[in-house]
Amino acid sequence: MAYPNGKLSEEKVFKDPVHRYVHVRDKLIWDLIGTREFQRLRRIKQLGTTYLTFHGAEHSRFNHSLGVYEIVRRMVDDVFKGRPEWDDSERELCLAAALLHDLGHGPFSHSFEKVFHLDHEDFTRGIILGDTEVNQVLRKVSPGFPQDVAEVIAKTYKNKQVVSLISSQIDADRMDYLQRDAYYTGVSYGHFDMERILRVMRPREDQIVIKESGMHAVEDYIMSRYQMYWQVYFHPVTRSAEVILTKILHRAKQLHDEGYVFTHAPVHFYSIFEGKLTLEDYVKLDESIILYYFQAWEDEEDAILSDLCRRFINRQLFQYVEFNPNEEMSAYFELTSLFKEAGIDPSYYLVVDSSSDLPYDFYRPGEEEERLPIHLLTQNGQIKELSRQSAIVESISGKRRTDHKLYYPKDLICDGTKHPEAKMKIRQLLGLT
């Protein structure tokens, strides 16, 4: 089945700094964009706290979702259309899944999820299948269409070609966010020749492959991703802001659990704190609400909550030192004791933060997170795995890079008016003297 009155009478376009224009010709897509659940993504930043490091990084999940849709639209309408190994009947499914793939992200996304043990993918599925405006639109295609969209996003849909468009090691999701995040942060790392990659993509059996002639463009894409993760996504200042953000949320929950009477009651958090979060509660949360509470809590009587909120709102972040957990745990335990002696709560002010990334991996069947490799289509029709053909990709393939940092409030430990001896020892251990 198809969406009623499938095509718009006139094409709609969004001006876009990455793709120039996002074209909408399908009434299904236009109606999905207009739903309250999709419009909510305007109020969720794509890069969370990164705006405190790169001031231009104010773009939203809404921007990114439109960009992923546009890339997939070009794939199915321009690159794959009419090819014998591509099924045009699943076009609407591809477009809807691309548009809605990030629908369940919450405020400050991964930091928020980590604190409250949530998974945005569960909420994406809930919005698509639940009593929502998005579900009402999808059901106009067919009663089973919402389930198909949810399965594509969850990577369980039967047609793996469709899944790979938005979830693989070279997909529309990554191709959009690398370029978009590079544009808004102002860095040069995320640039690669997407036009070339799209031109050499080919549907084959249960996957999308790349013609071997496009291998160098794919190499640039892989290296762009590597650089963006370590120069932007894992930037130590961004991580400092995330540390403070998570500690604010931890502190607020602890105070609630202890019966603390807030001057500014966190009414939007009650269902989360009490483990009773509903889908309706969740879709009402966005970053403007979170920041409202952070600003209000600057005036709370609890000194820790007030201080952490002041730091986040005014960008007075923690400093850091490199940390090796395999060799320096004894120093960490000593620092913990000294922080307590100095009257500084180490559970909120002494934090080890770790970042890890695997830029590209070959297929490892049976592993917890199987990654389907990128395959090249050679001139004689053979299919070869990318790292077997590219020395550049082979050099980083399967190699996980991990980085650990120890975050602390330099201003507090350099204030010698109270507990000067303990603070002197802290500074010595941190290499500040």
Swiss-Prot record:
Domain HD, chain residue ranges per copy: 61-178
Domain of life the protein comes from: Bacteria
CDD domains: HDc
Entry coiled-coil feature ranges: none
GO MF annotation list: dGTPase activity
Any single GO BP term: dGTP catabolic process
PANTHER family: DEOXYNUCLEOSIDE TRIPHOSPHATE TRIPHOSPHOHYDROLASE, DEOXYNUCLEOSIDE TRIPHOSPHATE TRIPHOSPHOHYDROLASE SAMHD1
UniProt name for this protein: Uncharacterized protein YwfO
Native source organism of the sequence: Bacillus subtilis (strain 168)
